[in-house]
Regions:
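Functionally engaged cysteine thiol sites
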Residues: 16, 184, 198
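ATP-dependent adenylation/nucleotidyltransferase module used to activate substrates
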Residues: 1-174, 204
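Glycine-rich phosphate/adenylate-binding loop
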Residues: 172-189
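Iron-sulfur (Fe-S) cluster-binding segments and ferredoxin-like electron-carrier domains
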Residues: 188-220
Length: 220
């Protein structure tokens, strides 16, 4: 069986890469260049994919997504201009576009399974990270691609960040998560015991919080 994994180079998608390697015979990783402020994540993703022994392909989707602090390199701690209840990092349509491209790529290589690291437990309120959204898109892709049923797997959907750290330990990729993954929205490469980043942005704060919770529980 073949699976396509959306690999950004961050903690969650890298953990899902190793989940996919345990659950599928062939794994193909894809990433997206959307002019993100932390574009170094793509370099890290390529390194991670090579170490994992999987093929990695980057799609250029610059100019196809709505404005956000990630695209415009703005203040990630402010609310979104689209909805004040969402953070500025919310990029409308991002996961929908990425998963649709992944579906098309599945058709090209003869795969039926997509793996993504979206999560609605410790997430930032992104509406495209909810399981209801994923289910709706899974149905649309299954109907529209003409290749039979598409399955979108979300191994982290109901896990806290601390539980995601534990999963990395279980999969034997904890060292890789700490050493190689880039979660920081600003692409800060300062190294700490929990990995690279700076606690000036929400993504890194969540990563750090989960790390110390997992450590306190004896999971890592």
């Amino acid at each position: 069986m073949k699976a396509v994994i959306l690999l950004s180079g961050g903690q969650d998608s890298t953990t899902c890469l190793y989940w996919a390697k345990q659950n599928f015979k062939e794994v193909y990783a894809i990433g997206f260049d959307y002019n993100q402020s932390h574009k170094i994540e793509l370099e890290q993703a390529a390194k991670i994919a090579k170490e994992a022994g999987v093929e990695y392909k980057i799609f250029n989707v610059q100019g196809l997504l709505a404005k956000s602090s990630l695209v415009e390199h703005g203040d990630h701690n402010q609310p979104s201009h689209l909805d004040k209840s969402l953070p500025a990092s919310f990029t409308a349509g991002r996961n929908l576009l990425f998963l649709t491209i992944a579906g098309s790529y599945c058709a090209d290589i003869g795969a039926s399974d997509i793996v993504t690291g979206v999560c609605q437990t410790d997430y930032s309120g992104y509406p495209d990270c909810r399981r209801t959204t994923i289910d709706a898109l899974q149905n649309a892709l299954s109907l529209g691609l003409g290749i039979g049923g598409i399955r979108i797997h979300t191994p982290l959907m109901y896990l806290t960040k601390a539980e995601t750290w534990r999963l990395a330990k279980d999969f034997g990729c904890l060292e890789i998560i700490i050493r190689d993954t880039m979660t920081d929205y600003n692409g800060d490469e300062t190294m700490h015991e929990w990995g690279m980043g700076n606690e000036s942005n929400p993504a890194t704060k969540l990563r750090v919080k989960g790390f110390y919770e997992a450590k306190e529980k004896g999971w890592i």
